[in-house]
A protein has these predicted regions:
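Extended, hydrophobic alpha-helical segments in both membrane/secreted and soluble proteins
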Residues: 104-115, 128, 132-136
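Active-site-adjacent bridging/hinge elements
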Residues: 2-4, 27-35, 78-88, 151-165
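Alpha-helical support elements that line or immediately flank enzyme active sites
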Residues: 52-82, 112-120
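Extended ligand-binding clefts on enzyme/binding-domain cores
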Residues: 45-66, 140-151
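The feature captures the catalytic groove of carbohydrate-active enzymes
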Residues: 86-108, 122, 140-171
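Acidic/polar, glycine-enriched structural segments that form the non-catalytic walls/loops
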Residues: 1-52, 122-124, 129, 133-139
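Aromatic- and histidine-enriched alpha-helix N-cap/loop-to-helix transition segments
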Residues: 49-56, 67, 99-107, 127, ...
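Glycine-rich, acidic and aromatic/proline-enriched surface loops and short helix-turn segments
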Residues: 30, 34, 64-85, 138-141, ...
């Protein structure tokens, strides 16, 4: 027996007639259908909270597939609520695990235009713009270099490319 949030496919699979592409589509749909239980988690066996960075893309795909954007609004609010711990937000919400990854809160901005396009979410976005400005202010005040890039990070930074791919970027 499997339990999951209500999930109806609203998106069209344009590769319906391609057997290989259909397998990938089906895998992705099943992963999102059964992996989202009120929130997005990387690994159901070991993680007790959910990650902001991975959750942004999983939540976006989940909402676009089924047309229900209520979980995305909950996702955003859950992470905005962590600002009392750190103005740049924490990486993992709804749990006691304290972790900060610089890029993750900034990735959440990708969700705003998607919600803004939906007539029923415009007010939600407008009401939270001040909170999003505070995130930008936090990173500008604490980590912005003269070139506009994040620098002097004292937290984990996902963007730690191998030296041969850095193009002179100092991690």
């Amino acid at each position: 027996i499997a339990r999951h949030m209500p999930f109806r496919i609203a998106a069209k699979n344009r590769y319906e007639n391609d057997a290989r592409a259909r397998k990938v589509w089906d895998l992705c749909v099943r992963t999102l259908r059964y992996g989202a239980q009120e929130q997005i988690q990387d690994c159901m066996e070991r993680e007790k909270g959910y990650y902001l960075g991975d959750g942004c893309y999983s939540m976006l795909a989940w909402c676009l597939l089924n047309g229900d954007f209520a979980p995305m609004r909950k996702f955003i609010d859950d992470f905005l609520r962590t600002s009392f711990i750190n103005g740049g937000l924490v990486t993992c919400a709804n749990c006691s695990f304290m972790q900060e990854i610089a890029e993750y809160p900034l990735m959440m901005f990708v969700l705003l235009p998607v919600l803004e396009e939906r007539g029923d979410s415009r007010e939600f976005v407008r009401e939270r713009l001040g909170d999003f400005r505070k995130i930008l202010d936090f990173y500008r005040e604490n980590y912005a270099g003269d070139d506009g890039l994040l620098s002097n990070l004292d937290k984990w930074c996902v963007v730690e490319w191998p030296s041969q791919w850095r193009d002179g970027y100092d991690v």
